């Protein structure tokens, strides 16, 4: 509860007794490494959340004593105990996929803000990701007990940076107005809540009359002011609140607390309402945590009230609830006349029966390799119940697996359970093939091999989107014998974290591991070496440079003559090489009827046979200059393959060639020697002739080094635009292609909305209580949260050498205060500048 992440929850009424796990989570401390959900050694060592962790508890618990916070709140609400499935997610930008896969399966979210830092860069990013999934959210401003905490400023930043109207439901209670943080003012219930002990076990409810007469008159006045602002804001988006306001003779303070709670709930359930409840507290001292949990129960939706899960079945998209209730046809409608009603009714009943036998539907959102238990698959059940030993059909992989054991998780600990019902999160042990994002269904009477009948065997819940990687490093096994163990360990690591990607560079032979950032890969390396015991090291990425010719060569002739396995092979050919523009138009140039042309990796090879009239003669044996056992097509392919093999290694620096045109000529009278000339011999002759032509061209005009040029799209705030553009164009040798408003990028970040579609937030109308020493928060008379401070998003499109983009993410975050992001892809190869080429060659020679 006290991490600086984006905590996401789902809840539903479940009448079970409370157990002691709640006390552990409330009184753990991220600062000393005792947080229950931060159980990895790296998390405890660094004091941050690295991977999402699930924990299930009940709220409200049985009151331990009459004066406790839980007792006071339980007496006020008299509500049954609820089951809360809480997932603690990381706050660091490198672990954004952990947030994404958690957001995908939750019903509500609690956004925890640092009261000192305010709305940070990663907060904005995750907020928009949650909006993309239309998840109801509440905000908890934490760490108000620290020096420099400013609740009012944070509320203003919520409005300006998150583009939402903050509905302030609590205000901080500062002792004496400017002293230490001692409690909160409950704007909904019109009372003060003061935590009287340092550990937060005891809370005292102070009425408005007592506040006004004996304790703090200014604080009581501020609570009334906050109540007026809250009712006015709710009236803008909830007609029923307007009716209650009129029923109470337009008295904001006369409206009952439950009426305000119901109004807040209605606004949150409306995904188009730009309103978010805001609460205050200090988790280190346990101040405000219990009212926050009450808000989770009272305001956030239960699984029954959440949006219908998106599914695809066959070619049809829709909602899972609509499918189960018969409101969605599992097949696309066929526009054909119905000839007989009797022929239609049985088919309709058959479809209904098929859907009725669907026992459960769940989404696997996380896979973890536990050293003691094996592979743990975290699932969210959307429909029905998954029972122990049930046969689950994976509709993505079209395979069936047994679920021999089910667990309810408490961070790293698990308790065996007989079933996972709808709306719950659980863990399945024993699944060998299931991956993150796979849909699992249980069907009554299904065939274990073929699964449920069509079209239910194609039922898939909305998948989890994996962001593209932006940071790369190489993985090198310590020896050849360690290659397979390292590959197996990487496969386990990638199954756990799909945001990691593994690939093999065909030119360098390096195994490349890519991820979301430097810290992400650092943690992956530690897990690979320490948890999976892989014997490998992580190094830097080697850039795949290319070599190009600067002048054409003369025609070079080569003869190949060698005896292999007792059979003599002999052939010859002539070849010449020349530079050419390796663009699409040049590569797409069509050969004539008498020559063969092929292009590969930016190079082109043309093959001609003296005396040949083209492939058409292959059907006419007469008149061909080649012997019958050498088809013209086979000769073309063999010669081209030999030339391309020679182009894989340049004459000067051994880089692969790029932008090279090779012409290979075969004269059957000079280069074919009866049965000794085979396809293999021709290929070897073409390789030797091409290598000779490349050496000749290099001797006459030299070669140049080419480097991969990346197409980079950078999203930054306008205030950071100048430094980023200057860095790209000067320090990194890039070329700026365009500077645009980031409407397209914002549309993807804001759930399909551009900035013009976002609600206009007039900060003058946003209520925020005064902060202690508020004058020091405004510098030069400008509110940092006000519009016009340079927080408009801009998009930079540039062409930058790949070498300069290695490790760029960390530098970009430094330039933009953590608010810059980028994506890149290979655009083309470009010749290196003189100074850069000299530096590279010095590096290669070890000077």
Q: Can you name each region flagged by the protein language model?
A:
Residues 1, 47, 88, 102, ...:
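Conserved structural-core and active-site-/substrate-pathway-adjacent residues in large, well-folded domains
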Residues 1-112, 168:
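P-loop NTPase switch module centered on the Walker A-proximal segment
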Residues 33-34, 47-52, 92-99, 103-106, ...:
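Amphipathic alpha-helical transducer elements in NTP-driven molecular machines
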Residues 77-84, 103-110, 237-245, 465-477:
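Gly-rich Lys/Arg/Thr-decorated short loops/hinges at beta-loop-alpha junctions or inter-strand turns
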Residues 83, 107-109, 133-140, 272-277, ...:
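Short, surface-exposed connector motifs at secondary-structure boundaries
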Residues 117-358, 362:
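P-loop NTPase catalytic nucleotide-binding module
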Residues 157, 163-168, 172, 298-301, ...:
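Accessory interaction regions appended to the cores of large information-processing enzymes
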């Amino acid at each position: 509860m006290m991490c600086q992440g984006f905590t996401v929850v789902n809840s539903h009424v479940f009448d079970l007794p409370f157990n002691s796990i709640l006390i552990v989570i409330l009184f753990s401390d991220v600062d000393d490494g005792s947080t229950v959900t931060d159980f990895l050694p790296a998390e405890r060592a660094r004091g941050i959340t690295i991977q999402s962790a699930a924990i299930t508890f009940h709220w409200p618990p049985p009151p331990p004593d009459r004066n406790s916070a839980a007792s006071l709140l339980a007496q006020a609400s008299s509500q049954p105990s609820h089951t809360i499935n809480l997932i603690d997610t990381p706050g660091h930008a490198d672990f954004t996929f952990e947030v994404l896969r958690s957001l995908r399966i939750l019903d509500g979210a609690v956004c925890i803000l640092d009261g000192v830092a305010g709305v940070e860069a990663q907060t904005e990013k995750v907020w928009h990701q949650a909006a993309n999934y239309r998840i109801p959210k509440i905000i908890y401003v934490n760490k108000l007990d620290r020096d420099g905490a400013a609740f009012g400023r944070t509320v203003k930043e919520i409005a300006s940076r998150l583009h939402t109207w903050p509905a302030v439901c609590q205000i901080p209670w500062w002792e004496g107005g400017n002293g230490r943080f001692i409690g909160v003012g409950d704007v909904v219930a019109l009372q003060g809540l003061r935590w009287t002990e340092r550990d937060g076990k005891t809370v005292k409810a102070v009425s408005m009359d007592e506040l006004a007469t004996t304790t703090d008159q200014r604080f009581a006045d501020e609570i009334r002011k906050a109540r007026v602002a809250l009712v006015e804001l709710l009236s803008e988006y909830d007609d029923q609140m307007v009716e209650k306001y009129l029923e109470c003779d337009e008295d904001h303070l006369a409206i009952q607390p439950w009426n305000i709670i119901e109004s807040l709930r209605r606004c949150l359930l409306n995904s188009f309402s730009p309103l978010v409840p805001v609460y205050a507290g200090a988790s280190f001292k346990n101040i405000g945590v219990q009212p926050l949990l009450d808000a989770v129960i009272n305001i956030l939706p239960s699984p029954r009230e959440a949006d219908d899960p998106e599914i695809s079945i066959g070619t049809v998209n829709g909602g899972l609830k609509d499918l189960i209730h018969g409101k969605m046809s599992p097949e696309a409608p066929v526009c054909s006349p119905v000839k007989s009603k009797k022929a239609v009714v049985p088919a309709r009943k058959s479809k209904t029966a098929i859907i009725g036998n669907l026992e459960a539907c769940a989404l696997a959102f996380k896979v973890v390799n536990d050293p003691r238990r094996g592979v743990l698959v975290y699932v969210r059940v959307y429909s029905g119940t998954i029972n122990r030993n049930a046969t689950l059909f994976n509709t993505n992989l079209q395979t069936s697996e047994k679920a021999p054991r089910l667990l309810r998780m408490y961070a790293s600990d698990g308790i065996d359970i007989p079933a996972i019902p709808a709306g719950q999160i659980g863990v399945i042990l024993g699944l060998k093939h299931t991956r993150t994002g796979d849909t699992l269904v249980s069907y009554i009477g299904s065939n274990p091999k073929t699964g449920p009948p069509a079209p239910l065997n194609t039922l898939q819940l909305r998948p989890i989107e994996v962001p593209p990687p932006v940071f790369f490093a190489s993985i090198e096994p310590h020896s050849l014998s360690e290659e397979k163990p390292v590959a197996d360990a990487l496969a386990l690591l990638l199954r756990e974290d799909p945001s990691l990607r593994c690939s093999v560079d065909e030119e360098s032979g390096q195994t490349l591991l890519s991820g979301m950032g430097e810290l992400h890969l650092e943690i992956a390396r530690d897990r690979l070496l320490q948890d999976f015991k892989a014997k490998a090291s992580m190094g830097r990425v080697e850039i795949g440079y290319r070599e190009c010719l600067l002048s054409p060569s003369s025609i070079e002739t080569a003869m190949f003559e060698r005896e292999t396995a007792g059979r003599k092979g002999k052939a010859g050919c002539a070849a010449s090489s020349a530079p050419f523009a390796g663009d699409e138009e040049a590569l797409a140039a069509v050969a004539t009827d008498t020559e063969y042309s092929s292009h590969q990796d930016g190079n082109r090879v043309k093959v001609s046979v003296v005396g040949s009239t083209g492939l058409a003669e292959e059907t006419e044996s007469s008149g061909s200059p080649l012997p019958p056992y050498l088809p013209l097509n086979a000769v073309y392919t063999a010669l081209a393959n030999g030339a391309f093999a020679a182009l894989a290694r340049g004459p000067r620096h051994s880089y692969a060639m790029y932008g090279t045109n090779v012409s290979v000529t075969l004269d059957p009278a000079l280069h074919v020697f009866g049965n000794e000339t085979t396809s293999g011999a021709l290929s070897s002759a073409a390789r030797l002739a091409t290598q000779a032509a490349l050496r000749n061209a290099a001797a006459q005009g030299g070669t140049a080094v080419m480097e991969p040029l990346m197409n980079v799209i950078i999203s930054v705030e306008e205030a950071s635009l100048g430094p980023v553009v200057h860095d790209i164009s000067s320090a990194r040798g890039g070329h700026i292609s365009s500077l645009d408003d980031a409407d397209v990028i914002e549309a993807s970040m804001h759930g399909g909305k551009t900035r013009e579609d976002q609600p206009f937030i007039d900060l003058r109308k946003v209520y925020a209580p005064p902060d202690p020493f508020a004058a020091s928060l405004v510098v030069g008379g400008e509110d940092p949260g006000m519009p016009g401070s340079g927080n408009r998003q801009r998009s930079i499109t540039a062409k930058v050498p790949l070498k300069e983009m290695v490790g760029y993410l960390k530098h970009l975050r430094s330039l933009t205060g953590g608010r810059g992001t980028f994506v890149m892809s290979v655009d083309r190869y470009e010749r290196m500048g003189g100074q850069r080429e000299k530096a590279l060659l010095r590096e290669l020679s070890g000077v």
